[in-house]
């Protein structure tokens, strides 16, 4: 009877595929400003990519596109029969996430394959039709809630199972396979979103990995306080933007190369690299959504656990510089990064360039963008600035001194985190009652086009201000994005020639060496004596 009711609703939905999008479609159907502000304060989330195909160690879902009929049949019919994660203990995941300073979780309730990790009436291709027969989504939400971690869900509008079941060729980024142009798929997806947002209580956020029109409206109507991340705010994938983006945004990145579990041919970022990504993202005003991919038996790979525990130690001492912070007047001075408390003039100076800082060793550095006041106080996060173990003769008080060349900071790391008495991860100095000491420049990327006659890219920018410098250098950078998903950016930026400027205004430069048939992103660059800043990214196709 349940399936009959669902099929009836599906047929009705096919006649009115965007009914929810057209009902009460006023200003209320959007992310609420106060909820986005809350989201920005959280700063650090855990992404969990898990699917039935983790059993064979393939890229999550995508192996279905271009697959043979036999492969698809066995994927849909056989893989669920052997999916039995008997070592699945979400309480352990949640406890580890809590230690690591995670504030919210986003779980892949349904990835592109269409396999549903919850007890759903919308398809037989779901977790209840496996030997496991437990609602994994429900258990994850409950376990993370118990730790005070806000629950979020990922839902893919693309659904390879639905396309296969309806005799359609599996494809990406073509209109006929998208819900917006496919009433039956839209109704199927809308029914799933309604289920997810009515079965499990309040859900703080939902991530639509594809065309969100017609689905985000269902989410906002069902739970008005929900935050739609991808589908409503910027969510760069596998990259941190070169500039702070406007408003709330979220970078989502993997620990290794893959989103799902990879038993072989995987290489991981170090714990230090993961911490650096968190620092850079927060310095630019965004959230970091760091991914794990559980094994088919339900355990986290040991490499992922190790990195979360390294992050946990760093966050145990330094979490104050991550939560409820906003960007400083500039994001960084070389390898020293900044976050500023949202409601006070407290600045966190996150020092990445003093690698392997030995305990008990004084370090001195100068900041150009910060000015002290009479009320300024300095300390190193995590330590009391009074005691160094076994050395009662030392007085490791952090000090600051304002001079003509900048703010001088003298600090000692005194906490013993490792047996070697070396600490490879950032040290954070907290400065209270400080002011900006510079005005940064501003560049805009205005146009990028292919000049067929000259066989080169003609790029145009606008230097809006030099800041407080008499001269700067301007230019452009490019990166190859051919064949990438619009959210995915994994290739490195390639610098172009810089030219000096002593005045504001438009500038045009040519970029040579771009390959025929490729698609590139282009961004303007301005190099100040203290910092390099960027304009927004534009797309350029080379014929």
Name these PLM-found stretches:
Residues 1-4, 97:
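Positively charged n-region of N-terminal signal peptides that target proteins for export
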Residues 17-21:
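Sec/Tat signal peptide C-region and signal peptidase I cleavage site
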Residues 437-543:
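Short, surface-exposed linear motifs at loops/turns and structural transition points
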Residues 22-440, 530:
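Mature catalytic domains of secreted/periplasmic carbohydrate-active enzymes
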Residues 6-15:
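Bacterial N-terminal signal peptides
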Residues 15-16, 298:
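Residues in and immediately flanking transmembrane alpha helices
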């Amino acid at each position: 009877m349940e399936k009959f009711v669902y099929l009836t609703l599906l047929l009705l939905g096919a006649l009115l595929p965007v009914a929810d999008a057209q009902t009460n479609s006023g200003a209320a159907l959007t992310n609420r400003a106060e909820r986005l502000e809350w989201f920005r304060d959280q700063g650090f989330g855990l992404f969990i990519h898990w699917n039935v195909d983790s059993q064979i160690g393939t890229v999550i879902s995508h192996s279905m596109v271009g697959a043979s009929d036999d492969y698809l049949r066995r994927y849909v019919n056989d893989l669920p029969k052997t999916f039995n994660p008997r070592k699945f203990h979400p309480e352990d995941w949640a406890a580890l996430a809590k230690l690591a300073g995670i504030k919210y979780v986003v779980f892949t309730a349904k990835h592109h394959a269409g396999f549903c990790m919850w007890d759903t009436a919308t398809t037989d291709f779901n977790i209840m039709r496996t030997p496991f027969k437990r609602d994994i989504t429900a258990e994850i939400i409950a376990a993370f809630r118990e730790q005070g971690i806000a629950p979020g869900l990922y839902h893919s509008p693309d659904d390879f199972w639905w396309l296969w079941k309806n005799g359609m060729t599996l494809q990406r980024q073509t209109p006929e396979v998208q819900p917006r142009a496919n009433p039956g798929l839209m109704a199927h997806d809308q029914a799933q979103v309604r289920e997810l947002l009515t079965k499990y209580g309040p859900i703080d956020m939902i991530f639509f990995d594809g065309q969100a029109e017609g689905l985000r409206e269902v989410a906002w109507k069902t739970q008005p306080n929900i935050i739609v991340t991808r589908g409503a705010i910027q969510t760069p994938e596998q990259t941190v933007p070169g500039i702070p983006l406007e408003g709330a945004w979220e970078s989502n990145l993997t620990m290794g190369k893959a989103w799902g579990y990879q038993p072989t041919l995987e290489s991981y970022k170090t714990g230090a690299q993961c911490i650096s990504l968190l620092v850079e993202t927060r310095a630019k005003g965004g959230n970091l959504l760091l991914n794990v991919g559980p094994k088919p038996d339900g355990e986290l790979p040991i490499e992922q656990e190790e990195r979360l525990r390294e992050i946990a130690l760093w966050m145990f001492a330094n979490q104050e510089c991550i939560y409820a912070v906003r960007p400083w007047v500039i994001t960084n001075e070389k390898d020293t990064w900044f976050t500023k408390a949202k409601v006070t003039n407290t600045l966190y100076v996150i020092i990445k360039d003093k690698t392997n800082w030995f305990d008990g060793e004084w370090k001195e550095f100068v900041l150009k963008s910060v000015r002290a006041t009479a009320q300024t106080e300095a300390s190193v996060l995590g330590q009391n600035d009074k005691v160094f173990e076994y050395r009662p003769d030392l007085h490791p008080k952090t000090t600051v001194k304002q001079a003509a060349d900048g703010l001088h900071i003298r600090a000692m790391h005194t906490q013993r985190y490792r047996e070697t008495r070396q600490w490879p991860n950032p040290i954070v100095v907290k400065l209270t009652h400080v002011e900006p000491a510079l005005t940064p420049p501003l560049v805009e990327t205005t146009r990028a086009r292919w000049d067929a006659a000259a066989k080169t890219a003609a790029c145009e920018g606008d230097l809006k201000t030099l800041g407080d410098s008499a001269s700067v250098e301007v230019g452009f950078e490019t990166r190859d994005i051919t064949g990438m998903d619009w959210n995915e950016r994994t290739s490195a930026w390639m610098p172009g020639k810089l030219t000096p400027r002593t005045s504001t205004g438009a500038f045009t430069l040519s970029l040579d060496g771009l390959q025929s048939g490729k698609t590139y992103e282009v961004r303007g660059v301005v190099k100040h004596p203290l910092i390099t800043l960027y304009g927004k990214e534009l797309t350029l196709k080379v014929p």
